[in-house]
Amino acid sequence: MRLAKYIGVMAKPQNDTTTAISMTAPVLMSRGAGDGADTPVGASEGSHSNPFSPEENAKTYKMAFFMPASRFSKASDAPKPTNPDVTIKDVPARTLAVHTFSGNLRQAAIAERGERLRRALEADGVAAKEGAEVMAAGYNPPWTPWFLKTNEVMLEVSGM
């Protein structure tokens, strides 16, 4: 909800200029708090129930989306969040391995597909970046029927 409030999905945007910002896809999810160095522009982190896994107990995760490049070419161009738990960051280019799948984006599916991606990389002789965490990406609004949803798991790779 923090990101939705920042961009003004349901009410007045919670940013220093009260500028409404278009929602973009994908929305990224990753487990674990950290310094956010790997988090795209428009990131929020904290301890919440994963919106993609409502049956889960509260977990710490990061949620992020990409700012529209047509309006904000760098993080400093974007309106400043009024909520200190929302951060805006530039993310350097990186190489990600991606596995696409359909269905609901649940923690069990993320874990299974992430492991499948790791095994495929290993079989192809591609190394995941040391300490890389699986990220989940959802491309559809919540009201999309489960069988029409497009999701991805992503893992940063090194040496490519």
Model-derived segments and spans:
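A solvent-exposed interaction/effector surface
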Residues: M1-M160
